[in-house]
């Protein structure tokens, strides 16, 4: 009987600890603005900011340009995203974690919270479907009352 109880407790601890809790956050106020891309060359300027970063290349293999999906979201919620060419992005510390472009990277106080991985099958529909992208990003950032 003790072994069964111990097994159940262990199982509950393992499964309970594996679930990653998502904590929503606000972007810095200045990004709740017009819904435009802001080109940036030096991410060091944003050390402690909380923002959305779009890293891109000049070619796209998706049927629908993912930039259109992102723009739909930006216009709907009037949220500005920073944009940086992937060649410049490779020179940043974020490149250690994000290896492919295009990508949307959610940054909180200068640290990556999560990102879309162009090399991951689970993220592909988020690049092509505005609703799926919106569902994903709204799990992380507050948008209540913005649309």
Residue ranges and their predicted role:
Residues 26-42:
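Post-signal peptide N-terminal segment of mature Sec-exported envelope proteins
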Residues 106-147:
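Non-catalytic, surface beta->alpha helical segment in thiol-disulfide oxidoreductase systems
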Residues 1-4:
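Positively charged n-region of N-terminal signal peptides that target proteins for export
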Residues 39-76:
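Local sequence-structure signature of Cys/Sec-based thiol-disulfide redox active-site neighborhoods
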Residues 18-20:
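Bacterial signal peptide processing site
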Residues 95-108:
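Structural micro-motif
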Residues 57, 78-91:
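Thiol-based oxidoreductase modules, predominantly thioredoxin-like and allied folds used
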Residues 13-16:
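C-terminal motif of bacterial Sec signal peptides marking the signal peptidase cleavage site
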